[in-house]
Amino acid sequence: MRVDADDFARPCGDGKMHHEIKEILIEPGAVNALEEAMSEGFLKEYISPLLICDTNTCKATEKLMEDIFDRCQVLVLDADDLQADQHAIEIVENYMDEDIDLILAVGSGTVHDISRYVAFQYKIPF
């Protein structure tokens, strides 16, 4: 299922429209669509993306995502007791390079919550 984030965009409290989320893709084979978007699609403009996933997702998709991992800075969070809390946010913040221009979350809802929060704090597209 492809979700166009513009369908859910609403003006912020400051009256402006903010578009931090480009697209949400939930379907079998989503990894293939991500690779295509990075090489030929709407994500090709980003030169220094940070991909965040957890150990479960990394293990399950490692072979499929080899090309994507080569194009990104990759942070693999330990899935054991992973929570969207200050500790996880600090791990991401300490790992990030200054030139990160996109954050990609691959995997669980917790990974997405952490990624979305950091992207919002640093005003990086997500």
Where are the regions that the model predicts?
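Glycine/threonine-rich beta-strand-loop-alpha-helix active-site module
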Residues: 84-126
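ATP/NTP phosphate-donor binding region
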Residues: 1-102
